[in-house]
Amino acid sequence: MAPQLNIGMVGLDTSHCLAFTRILNDRRDEYHISGAEVVAAYPGGSESFSHSRNRVQGFTQQMGDEYGVQIYDDIATLTRHVDAILLESVDGRQHLEQFEQLAIGKPVYIDKPLATTTADAYALVDIAAQTGTPIMSCSALRYAA
């Protein structure tokens, strides 16, 4: 049996964090993907964005209670416990700042939006190249069943 891929998640302010965790962690889910599990998360959140501010606490609670995900207080600690990262923050204005902390050579999936400005998108790609960090960004609907 291949070793499990331990995934960390940054940004627990979107329903996507629960959807991805369910298909990776819940073996009973009809779309379960074996071989990987979300094991660690950093809540993040954006006080200036109501879609984030109003949801981060509840989603963080669910991640820990329903899926046993270890919640960390900072990104650096999270990265030491995982093999790959899902950057899920709903407020795309935070993606560049968060990615700067995540760019340590481990693969990072950046949920939509990749960035909110062209300059930030180019900066993300430059940082990924400089640090040897593989990145991917897309809408999850592209892969929906």
Predicted regions and their residues:
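N-terminal glycine-/serine-/threonine-rich beta1-alpha1-beta2 phosphate-ribose binding loop
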Residues: 1-104, 121-122, 130-131
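Conserved short-loop catalytic and cofactor-binding motifs
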Residues: 8, 112, 138
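Hydrophobic residues in well-ordered beta-strands that form the structural core
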Residues: 73, 110, 135-137
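Proline- and acidic/polar-enriched loop/turn elements at helix boundaries
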Residues: 76, 91, 113-114, 140
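Short helix/strand-capping hinge loops at secondary-structure junctions
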Residues: 107, 112-113
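A contiguous active-site-proximal alpha/beta segment in oxidoreductase catalytic domains
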Residues: 115-145
